[in-house]
Every structure is written in C-alpha cells, then in structure tokens.
A protein has these predicted regions:
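Membrane topogenic/interface segments and analogous intrinsically disordered interaction regions
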Residues: 1-279
Length: 279
C-alpha cells in the first residue's frame, strides 16, 4: 500500500484542481461585462440619434436662440451673419444638432451609465452615486447659463465696441455662422467642464485622497492652475479667461465646504460605529 503525502497550502485555501486556468475562469464574467457595456452604449447612442433628428429639425430655431447674446450686445438690433462656403451652414446645423442632442439625451446617457455601474456597488454606494450624476448635469447647465446670460453678451459687447464708423473707413463685425457657433460652444464646454470642480473634489474626498485642510493649503496653487486651465479652455481674449476663472475659483471654495461636510459625515459615522457594542 502506498501512501501519498500532501503538503498543506500555507495560505489555508484549497489548491485549484488540475487543469484550472484563472484566465479562462475570468473570461466569462469579462464577456458578460462587455456585452452589458455594448448594450448600454447602444441605448445611449439611440438616445443621441433620436435627439439628433429632433434637434436637426429645429436647428435654425436653436441657432437663433444662441444668437440672442449677439443681438443683445448689438442693442437689440438685427444682426447679419454670413457663410462663405456653400455647405458651411449645413455643416454648422449638423454640428449644432449633435451638440444639442447630447444635451437632450443626457438623462438617457446618465441612466445607462448608472445601470452599468450600479451592479458593482453596494446599496449605500448606489444611493450616493445617483446625486453625483444629477449634480454633474446641473452644474454643466449652470456653466452654460453663465455663458449665455452673462459672459457671451458682455464678450460680444466688447468686440462690437471695436468697430469703426467714420467718413474715411468702415470696419464692422460680420460674423460667420460657423465661427460664431464654435465660439459659443467653446465657452459652453469650457465653463461646463470647469463647473464640475465641486463634484470632482467631493468624489476625491469620499475616496480619501484629499481633505479640506489640504485644499486650503493648496489654494494659492489652485488659483494659478485654474487661471492656466481657463486660458486654455476659453477663447483667446482676457475677458473670457477672467470670466471663466473667477466663477471656478468660487466653485473651488464651494468644493472646500463640500469636502468639509464629507469629512464631518465620515467622522460622525465612525463615532457612531465605535459606540455600537461589539458582537
């Protein structure tokens, strides 16, 4: 009779059976995740496509709405815009329709993101994740609103003040439809991204990467960084850069307040758990 001796696994876990392949075992869950991702992307793209059709149908009306800051800066008088290439206005409307469609379909996109991420989160994490999706959209809308109602009218007022009307020379602004759209879209995207700062800081605080005191100590460097980023994201004029940087600095201060709140919540939760009897 032969005796087969086995060496115990020092980790305390059973050895995998012969022929076991960890890569093969993980393939099925990975494929399931990829299938789920594909499905969510399809739903999101369908939402964008439907929004694109709707927005392209009303592209001229949407463009007229975006021209309002220009009209206001021109003292309410009718403005004349030009296009110098036959298909230019068509391509401008296509670009505008896609831009507006993403806005219109954002609730669908956010819902699909949540559906994809939620299965990997605990219940309390899912409850904490949803407000961030809503806050992201609302802060982007806030940034777009600041551009539309404050920044863009003042910027256009400044540029129109550079026109020259004299007996010898007439220099006046004749904005191209494509360039005006690119200008206002750049501002909206730039402000929308910069206005996400409180959300980003709060998420970093929840993950334990930053604290309120760290943000206070880093404030002077943050102001320099915000100014530099605003110079990159905003159009190349000082007024736009300042108009983007100042609200973002205020949002940085709001982010500090939010991070302090997160830290207080964490401390209160830890104290409550410490007071609970063991077992």
């Amino acid at each position: 009779m032969s005796v087969t001796s086995t060496t115990p696994n020092p980790s305390g876990s059973a050895d995998p059976p012969d022929g076991f392949d960890e890569i093969e075992a993980s393939k099925a869950p990975l494929i399931d995740h990829l299938i789920e991702l594909r499905q969510r992307l399809i739903y999101a793209l369908v939402g964008v496509a439907i929004g694109f059709v709707i927005c392209f149908t009303f592209a001229t009306q949407i463009y007229n709405i975006l021209v309002w800051p220009y009209v206001w800066a021109n003292n309410g008088q009718k403005v004349e815009m030009i296009f110098t290439n036959p298909p230019e206005f068509l391509f401008t409307k296509l670009k505008l329709a896609l831009f507006a469609a993403v806005f219109l379909a954002f609730p669908i996109i956010a819902h699909q993101v949540y559906k994809f991420v939620a299965p990997g989160l605990y219940r309390n994490e899912r409850a904490a994740f949803r407000p961030y999706l809503v806050a992201t959209f609302l802060l982007f809308l806030l940034g777009a609103g600041v551009v539309y109602f404050i920044v863009m009218p003042l910027v256009m007022k400044f540029f129109l003040s550079m026109q020259i009307h004299s007996d010898d020379v007439q220099i006046q602004l004749q904005a191209k439809v494509s360039e005006y759209l690119s200008f206002i879209m750049t501002l909206i995207l730039g402000f929308g991204i910069m206005f996400q700062l409180p959300v980003a800081l709060t998420l970093l605080a929840r993950a334990g990467f930053i604290g309120g005191q760290q943000l206070r100590d880093f404030r002077r460097y943050a102001i320099v960084a915000i100014t530099g980023i605003a110079a990159v994201l905003s159009p190349p004029d000082p007024f736009s850069m300042i108009a983007m940087a100042l609200p973002t600095i205020l949002l940085y201060e709001a982010g500090i307040w939010r991070v302090d709140w997160v830290e207080k919540q964490r401390t209160a939760k830890a104290a409550a758990e410490a007071q609970q009897p063991a077992g």
